[in-house]
């Protein structure tokens, strides 16, 4: 009989990088999150969907979100709960500020040891960095097997998974033992919509910091009455870490500048479609090394 699984989805609240302005970076080389609207990282939504599908295959399984960020990152935990997740953990502390992928993966791996897991699922990469490093780094730090570029979990039997992954020129089906880390592509199934009943049920979910800010609110009273509305908040004090590996101190990478690049044509040439025009275009493209 297949046992129930504790599935942890690594997710990130990211700035919407589709409209990056001059205020996108701080002088210290970190993202100015206050200057950009925040969204659920797209491929992490694909990861959430695969986790929820696996939960449905294994009765009794749970899906929890683990995200590292400021207090407002609790929003994506609530969003995940609206879609089917059971709860979440917000890893938040000023000591995490300035973390690159190395420091982030270290903090996440320490938190994962604290909360426990049978399977860790993450999006391939975050749109505010495009490194695709955090998932593999977490696997390395935890000593777990990793499967990247995943687009489907075909079977989950016993303590192993059969996974289809997307490669450059096709797909590959592999078997992997659990516990493991898998990172999920955008080619995986799109996340399911929010469920209206779950929205009504979990809209009151809060972290302790939010409760402390409004202790007499209706939301705070609802959380006090229902444990399932309590989102766990973890700080450096709650996990076993070497603080020299956190935040700025643990981050060898610094971003100097981010620009929104828009390519504009300086001139345009209209072609009639005649053979002579096409031949002339081919000569120009070859001469400019665009072709050939």
Task: Describe the residue ranges of each PLM region.
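N-terminal glycine-rich FAD/FM-binding segment characteristic of electron-transfer flavoproteins
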Residues: 1-292
């Amino acid at each position: 009989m297949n046992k129930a699984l504790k599935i942890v989805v690594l997710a990130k609240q990211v700035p919407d990088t589709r409209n990056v302005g001059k205020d996108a970076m701080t002088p210290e080389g970190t993202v100015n999150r206050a200057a950009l609207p925040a969204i659920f990282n797209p491929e992490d939504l694909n990861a959430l969907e695969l986790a929820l599908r696996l939960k449905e295959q294994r009765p009794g399984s749970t899906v929890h979100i683990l995200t590292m960020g400021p207090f407002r990152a609790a929003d994506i935990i609530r969003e995940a709960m609206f879609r089917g997740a059971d709860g979440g953990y917000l890893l938040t502390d000023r000591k995490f500020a300035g973390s690159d992928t190395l420091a982030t993966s270290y903090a996440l791996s320490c938190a994962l040891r604290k909360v426990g897991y049978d399977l860790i699922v993450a999006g391939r990469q975050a749109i505010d960095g495009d490194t695709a490093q955090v998932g593999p780094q977490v696997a390395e730090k935890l000593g777990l097997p990793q499967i990247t570029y995943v687009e489907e979990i075909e079977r989950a039997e016993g303590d192993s998974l059969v996974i289809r992954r997307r490669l450059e020129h096709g797909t590959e089906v592999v078997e992997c033992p659990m516990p493991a880390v898998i990172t999920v592509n955008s080619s995986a199934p799109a996340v399911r919509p929010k469920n209206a009943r779950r929205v009504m049920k979990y809209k009151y979910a809060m972290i302790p910091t939010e409760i402390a800010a409004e202790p007499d609110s209706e939301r705070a009273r609802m959380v006090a009455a229902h444990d399932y509305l309590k989102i766990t908040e973890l700080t450096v004090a709650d996990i076993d870490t070497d603080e020299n590996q956190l935040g700025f101190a643990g981050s060898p990478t610094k971003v100097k500048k981010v620009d929104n690049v828009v390519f504009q044509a300086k001139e345009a040439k209209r072609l009639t479609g005649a053979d002579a025009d096409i031949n002339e275009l081919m000569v120009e493209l070859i001469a400019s090394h665009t072709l050939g």
